[in-house]
From Swiss-Prot:
Component of the eukaryotic translation initiation factor 3 (eIF-3) complex. Its main location: cytoplasm. The lineage of its organism: Eukaryota, Fungi, Dikarya, Ascomycota, Pezizomycotina. InterPro entries: eIF3_g, eIF3g_N, eIF3G_RRM, Nucleotide-bd_a/b_plait_sf, RBD_domain_sf, RRM_dom. It comes from Phaeosphaeria nodorum (strain SN15 / ATCC MYA-4574 / FGSC 10173). This is Eukaryotic translation initiation factor 3 subunit G. CDD domains: eIF3G (cd12933), RRM_eIF3G_like (cd12408). RNA-binding component of the eukaryotic translation initiation factor 3 (eIF-3) complex, which is involved in protein synthesis of a specialized repertoire of mRNAs and, together with other initiation factors, stimulates binding of mRNA and methionyl-tRNAi to the 40S ribosome. The eIF-3 complex specifically targets and initiates translation of a subset of mRNAs involved in cell proliferation. This subunit can bind 18S rRNA. One of its GO terms (molecular function) is RNA binding.
Length: 281
């Protein structure tokens, strides 16, 4: 059937348009680059010309001859017959990681672990006095001359005829020189002050103290039985509350004995106080 005169077949015109597109051209330039020209028909029916200029750069690198030889090997398995180089469907290309072995890597890791463990222990450690169990250093304890460290036993008095006594100037065991003021005292030293030295035997240890107690409260209670020279209430450094024990010192031991008798079992802050003489050093 012939086509009526004056009627246009758009499908045939599209075919003719596609067939009429020029072929791709490649032109080599003097500088070594290539100019590639292509033609296409867009969705709007218009023709578009695309010109690309490509310059190839050859980079030469020096590699190990063995590596270069392995690259020339014939591929096998799923890669058989494929060109040189990695194929995306069978090979996963990732970043090259440089591996540098270390001789003592295991020992270094263990040392780092030990250091971290020690730091954690020191971070959680708290200062604790060996004498009164307070949160301060033992050397700064106000009762270091009154009480002995917990677990220590006071040395026995040495007889007058023992080696290293006041009659000689040598030490008891090592044969070293002992100053005159230390002879006869087992190396403990002589306290200065003479008759003005305080009587540390008049110190009371008060336990089961309320955590809300204050030093002034204890001073007011114990001052009824004599002259109180000092009061020490152990407190927690973080919370500021009492830790449950305190020390009260009197100027006279008689007053301390009277206070110990009266205050032992005394109710304070919904708790029963336990009062006793502090152990001597």
């Amino acid at each position: 059937m012939s086509r009526p005169a004056g009627r246009t077949d758009w499908a045939e015109e599209d075919d003719e348009t596609e067939l009429a597109l020029p072929s791709q051209t490649v032109v080599k330039n003097k500088d070594g680059s290539e100019t590639i020209t292509t033609y296409r028909v867009g969705e709007d029916g218009r023709r578009y010309k695309t010109t690309r200029r490509i310059k190839k750069t050859v980079i030469k690198t020096t590699v190990n001859p063995r590596v270069a030889e392995r690259k020339q090997w014939a591929k096998f398995g799923q890669e058989k017959g494929k060109p040189a180089g990695p194929q995306t469907d069978t090979v996963s290309v990732a970043e090259n990681i440089l591996f540098r072995p270390v001789a003592a890597w295991k020992a270094s890791n263990e040392d780092k672990g030990d250091e971290a463990k020690k730091k954690a222990e020191l971070k959680n450690a708290k200062i604790k006095c060996r004498i009164c169990q307070g949160d301060h250093f033992t050397t700064k304890c106000p009762f270091k001359d009154t009480m002995a460290p917990e677990g220590d036993v006071a040395p026995a008095d040495m007889p007058d005829d023992a080696p290293g006594s006041a009659s000689g100037g040598l030490g008891a065991g090592g044969g070293g020189y002992v100053p005159p003021h230390l002879r006869g005292r087992a190396g403990a030293g002589e306290k200065m002050g003479g008759k003005f030295d305080r009587d540390d035997s008049a110190t009371l240890r008060v336990t089961n103290v309320s955590e809300f107690a204050e030093e002034q409260d204890l001073r007011d209670m114990f001052s009824r039985y004599g002259h109180v020279t000092r009061v020490f209430l152990a407190k927690d450094r973080e919370t500021g509350r009492a830790k449950g024990f305190a020390f009260v010192s009197y100027a006279d031991r008689t007053d301390a004995a009277k206070a110990c008798e009266k205050m032992d079992g005394f109710g304070f802050g919904h708790l029963i106080l336990r009062v006793e003489f502090a152990k001597k050093a």
